[in-house]
Amino acid sequence: MVLKVRDLDRSLAFYRDLLGFRVASEMSNVMIFLTATGENHHDLGLLRVGDSAPSPIPTAVGLYHVAIQLADWDAVKRAHAILSEHGLLRGSADHGVSRSLYTADPDGNEIELYCDAPRDEWEGRVDTVMTVRPLALD
């Protein structure tokens, strides 16, 4: 996935310093490729389009949000602490099949950070358990 961003440095600080992505390569201040695991060249590309680029229109077709799967529940709790510390936590939810946090990157792209719920809690019952409930973080 490649996201268009206004400011590469600001976006890099968010994805690298807060979300833990690593720089895989850069293209002369135009594009940065980031990896989450190091197992492939990149999981996310950031393409600079400039400070005057308009924001996406919420009611237009296009990307709703980016969902990034974290390793486990402990990783979600760590992400909650980091986002809360920086005032970037927009919401959280227990979806029955997953546990999710919501934030936005510097350009307003909504980001969901989640881990799957244990399979035995939902397998074969997704249509009855998939919901939006408050997320208990204790």
Model segments located where?
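Core segments of cupin and vicinal oxygen chelate
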Residues: L3-R48
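Short, solvent-exposed beta-strand edge segments and adjacent coil->beta transition regions
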Residues: V61-H65
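Acetyl-CoA-dependent GNAT
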Residues: L47-D51, D116
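Short beta-strand/turn micro-motifs at beta-sheet edges
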Residues: D51-I57
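Short, solvent-exposed cationic patches
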Residues: V126-D138
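A short, polar/proline- and glycine-enriched secondary-structure boundary/capping micro-motif
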Residues: P56, W122-R125
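Vicinal oxygen chelate
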Residues: V5-D9, V66-E110, C115-E121, L135-D138
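Short glycine/proline-enriched turns and hinge-like loops at secondary-structure junctions
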Residues: M27, I57-A60
